[in-house]
Amino acid sequence: MVVEQIEVIEHRIIEEGRRPSGGPLLGNTVPFSTIRESRESYEQRADGTIHDRRYEVTGERDVSREPSFLHTSANYGQHIETSPPPVQRYNVSGATNSSFLNTSGDSRVSYPGADRSNDTTVINNYGYDIHEVRTDDGGARIIETHGSGPLRETSRIEHVEETITRPSAMRSSSAAAQRSSSNIFTVPAPAAHVSYRQEFASDNESLARKDSYRAMQSSWDGDEKKMTSTLNSRRFPPQSQTSLVSRETDQHSGKKIGCLKKIRTFYQGVRYAFENSEYTPELLRSLCCILLLLLLLLFLMFIIFNAIFNRYAVSEFLLYPPVCEECRRKNPALVSAALPSSVFVHFFSKHQAHFELRGNQPFKSNSFTAVDFNTGYVAYADHSLTDANGKHFTCFLMPLDRSAIDSIDQLSEAVSESSYEIQSTFGWQEFYQFDPEKIEPMTAKQKFTEEIDDCEGAQWYLLRQTVHARDASCSECYDFCLPDWAVVRKEKYEDESTLGVRRLNCFRLYVPQWSNFRVETDIGGGHWKYPLSSESTKRDKNGEWVHWIPTTNAQGFSRSRKSINNATLV
């Protein structure tokens, strides 16, 4: 452990003389004897740096450096010894005067020939104190004068020097026992690092207050000294050691403050600043700049989060079909302005995109489509093929045509460039070029990266493309047309693309669950009407049923089937 030593050296140099204020014998006057006295005290402490530097922050009065605690004047605490008084005392002018010295401070002017028989010699006391403190970081020197005036009839010099040294280890006993009796007559320069010492027998009475105060400060236990040495090695700024609240208490109290309390304190501070501040033009301009920066930051955050989450958001569009000339030819009473169909596009994952269709004419029902761009397959679930619990009992599988939609990035770009209302000028034709073929559910599940929840436990059909037209051999089959989604150009020579329906993939399928329902033609003619209306099988953008009506509770259908000639359907 490194022990630091503080040496407090006090030097007092007293020059005492008595001279008359004037007279012819001024040049023959001999001053009396001079006594020099020095006091020295040693104290050893490991935490001397903190004790000596605490006064710089707390503003305490250091009794070891304050001259008012040690003496009140130049004569305080000194024993003035004089040689045996002569028979006669002379003033400067040579006149004899046997009167005693007057130290009352009365100053009188002497002139030749004046009657000074009853006059006393005036002695003016004058002195100064020099305080020097040298540390590793620097030092300070303070000179304080006191007395009633300049030295005139008497001279007195008092020199107090306090030197603080901090050796790396304790001085040896032999070095500490060395004594020096040389007199010091010079004042040390501020820039030079020189210590002037006079070592005599220490006077415990004059430094009793200082020693007791330092003893009180050094009465800590071993743990406190170790902690102080650690803090001193970190070179913290000087702090007072006399405070009742330690640094550890402040640190622990700061850690206990919660985040909510810190926010509340910060809010209260800002509110107090706004309530008590003076609203000058400069302050208002600063507040406006801060507000603009906050708005800009919010706008940038909105753009960033929109770019991140928009890919997995749900987009809704209205699809207007082209004018159906064939439908108008078959049914002249049909209104030419068809109602639009709505579609919800949901980017389910980085590999799948889902389409939720609320179909109107020429669509015969609502449907769900899942496109897996990783495996290259498409799953269809017609909402008319559901049971009383809303579960699909039939799903369809077909390969993805890359010429229609190449990737999910292309689809995302088309969705971002599409307007809310999409007017189609071509497409939407019915193509009966597919034949359904039953496959195992396990085989169908292997065709997709993520499992299709709507087709869980359903019967799968693979739609194989053929070259023949609609098969008329099945008299009890229903016609199904599913949308073939594609990315198309908005105009012929424009680069912007949009979402569209390239065609309708149609086929005929026998549904055994509908064998007990009566067959009716739809409003367009040429197709059988599904037992479950499309108004009862709509779903929202989250995939939840809207106005769901189970098949068993559907009104307007009877349990008996009515035979209809197949020729009337052609």
From Swiss-Prot:
Bias type Polar residues, positions: 93-107, 228-246
Keyword Membrane on entry: yes
Cellular component GO terms, alphabetical: membrane
Signal peptide per UniProt: none
Ranges where the BRICHOS domain occurs: 369-461
Region (Disordered): 93-116, 218-248
Membrane topology qualifier: Single-pass membrane protein
Keyword annotations: Disulfide bond, Membrane, Transmembrane, Transmembrane helix
Presence of the UniProt keyword Transport in the record: no
Organism: Caenorhabditis elegans
Major localization class: membrane
Topology, Extracellular side: 310-570
Compartmental location: Membrane
Protein name per UniProt: BRICHOS domain-containing protein C09F5.1
